[in-house]
């Protein structure tokens, strides 16, 4: 299955998203839905565990489990890892959705920089901690449109 990678221009999101090639270029081999979902989950877990940054408690638990520590440390590592990977996956999907809906930010470095400036301002506002990455990006986009 041929895919190409599209890098997301978000300063918090490190990595690239797999994007299927247009159907005119190649036709991917279809897999049953359950297998595709399992493969996507496995890929995103592998991807998030290979990030250049890892939360310190996750790294600590990871090293403990690698040294064959007791079962509880190993279990905590698996839980921390899965929570981190799930949050990473959700964040990445939300950012990808936003940039698919607003491709102008992927075409212009200047527009992207303006969006990121507004994004940072939104993050610093009281009450913004409960917003998802998509809502925060959308709020920054709406502010830019109002200018």
Swiss-Prot record:
InterPro entries: InvH. Residues 1-15 form the signal peptide. It is a lipid-anchor. GO terms for cellular component: cell outer membrane. It holds the Pfam family InvH. PROSITE patterns: PROKAR_LIPOPROTEIN. It is found in: Cell outer membrane. Keywords: Cell outer membrane, Lipoprotein, Membrane, Palmitate, Signal, Virulence. A lipid is attached at residue 16 (N-palmitoyl cysteine). A lipid is attached at residue 16 (S-diacylglycerol cysteine). Transmembrane segments: none annotated. Belongs to the InvH family. Involved in the synthesis of the type III secretion system (T3SS), also called injectisome, which is used to inject bacterial effector proteins into eukaryotic host cells. Pilot protein that is required for the proper localization of the secretin InvG/SctC in the outer membrane. Necessary for efficient adherence and entry of these organisms into cultured epithelial cells. This is SPI-1 type 3 secretion system pilotin. It comes from Salmonella choleraesuis (strain SC-B67).
């Amino acid at each position: 299955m041929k895919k190409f990678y599209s890098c997301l221009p978000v300063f918090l999101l490190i990595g690239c998203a797999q994007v299927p090639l247009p159907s005119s270029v190649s036709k991917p081999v279809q897999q049953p839905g359950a297998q595709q979902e399992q493969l996507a989950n496995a890929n995103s877990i592998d991807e998030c565990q290979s990030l250049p940054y890892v939360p310190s408690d996750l790294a600590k638990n990871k090293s403990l489990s690698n040294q064959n520590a007791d079962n509880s440390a190993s279990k905590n590592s698996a839980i921390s890892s899965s929570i981190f990977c799930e949050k990473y996956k959700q964040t990445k999907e939300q950012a990808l959705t936003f940039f698919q809906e607003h491709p102008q930010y992927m075409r212009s470095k200047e527009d992207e920089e303006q969006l990121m400036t507004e994004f940072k301002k939104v993050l610093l506002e009281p009450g913004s901690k409960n917003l998802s990455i998509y809502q925060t990006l959308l709020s920054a986009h709406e502010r830019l449109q109002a200018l």
